[in-house]
């Protein structure tokens, strides 16, 4: 996302939520003296920003069902091969091919990696609206499965990527072993971030997310091997 898009998202967020002005400056790239604090929880290494000037960590808490911006404003919903089966069955499709044909889009897009290296992704994405087109990939569209109460009509069989928010994750090769890493997505859409002196308040969330994030990365990697998605680096 561009800084302009993030600022627009923050402006929209602040119409309904109080958002710490220090965090706003950080999200907009105006605070740059930041330490990447890495902590291993089970099989995932989390990268938590530490603001040196404030001597504070950035933590996160869940505001659902009062907030469901992650469902209203996600840019895409890439599916794993597991998702193709479970969601297809949930939508009463007798075979996966018909589900893919009618309910998904195959798109190719570029994403910056954690080191700044560009990654080209090709994924099968769930349509967030019935008539979504490939040209709308990456734009904010409210998910058609979100009901008036802020709940997902597919739950618990919603896409695996939905369970990751607000984290982004990736794999790194460490001495021949794949290691899962995760950090926050700062898109300007989530009111759940706050400043804290230590990580104690978020220990339970990190434990729960470590399992979710690890399992998703294994499923995503398997999806690549099975030919339902592709990744290349430039």
What residues fall within each predicted segment?
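Short loop/turn segments that flank or connect secondary-structure elements
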Residues: 1-234
